[in-house]
Amino acid sequence: MMTQMNYTGKVKRVAIIANGKYQSKRVASKLFSVFKDDPDFYLSKKNPDIVISIGGDGMLLSAFHMYEKELDKVRFVGIHTGHLGFYTDYRDFEVDKLIDNLRKDKGEQISYPILKVAITLDDGRVVKARALNEATVKRIEKTMVADVIINHVKFESFRGDGISVSTPTGSTAYNKSLGGAVLHPTIEALQLTEISSLNNRVFRTLGSSIIIPKKDKIELVPKRLGIYTISIDNKTYQLKNVTKVEYFIDDEKIHFVSSPSHTSFWERVKDAFIGETDS
């Protein structure tokens, strides 16, 4: 969905976030040298209007988590300096085009849904997180056994390696490698995908991905105490004695700078997984 922030002539605060690769540092250096003397821009990692991520999707995920509490004020734009990045609009040789587009920028943005996760521990503590791609739960040892509850109704008893819940844009990441569907981000929904479920005459699960609309809630209730591996995008945590994991579509969204260079979702999917096709 395209909307617009109010940028009537104000100086844009820009944060530049880059990974440690030589090419990324070179691009960052060029951007710094241009913006530091430009009266229309102010370089600052504090309270930025625009965050420029230089690297790939991993760097964009890191930038998202750096500013996940400021999503209502921040727009992102990505430059990829290696393999094609799903979230990035510019290649490293298109820096001048990016600078020109930012000078012409009127505050237009493309917005995508994100995931909100609430993890309840056996002592009553609740750990909350946001994910741009997906959140997964796995058991460190033995098979994971958990009830899957949708809108307070027990849907199935899961036995297997784990569960992944992804956003529409995240549907092209780990979810796709698990055999999940690719979901367009204008569909505000979550996708639940099983990780190596056990299915036999005794234990049965649906065995296919489930698309959950925004108004619905997913709950995962582990039936065994122990250590669980919780992955939120590119961050992994080990938590002991998880009693419940809840998943929602967040009220906030991630916003990307909209410009003539913004690549449509299906173009990104084609470029990432199919490449050039015969005419």
Swiss-Prot record:
Record's keyword annotation contains Metal-binding: no
Enzymatic reactions: NAD(+) + ATP = ADP + NADP(+) + H(+)
Principal EC category: transferase
Database matches in InterPro entries: ATP-NAD_kinase_N, ATP-NAD_kinase_PpnK-typ_C, NAD/diacylglycerol_kinase_sf, NADK
Any one of the GO BP annotations: NAD metabolic process
Keyword terms: ATP-binding, Cytoplasm, Kinase, NAD, NADP, Nucleotide-binding, Transferase
Compartment(s) where it occurs, according to its Swiss-Prot or TrEMBL record: Cytoplasm
GO cellular component: cytoplasm
Residues at the catalytic site: D57 (proton acceptor)
Record GO terms (molecular function): ATP binding; metal ion binding; NAD binding; NAD+ kinase activity
Keyword hit for Transmembrane helix: no
Predominant localisation class: cytoplasm
Function text: Involved in the regulation of the intracellular balance of NAD and NADP, and is a key enzyme in the biosynthesis of NADP. Catalyzes specifically the phosphorylation on 2'-hydroxyl of the adenosine moiety of NAD to yield NADP.
NCBIfam families attached to this UniProt entry: PRK04885.1
Name by which UniProt lists this protein: NAD kinase
Species this protein is from: Streptococcus pyogenes serotype M12 (strain MGAS2096)
Lineage: Bacteria, Bacillati, Bacillota, Bacilli, Lactobacillales
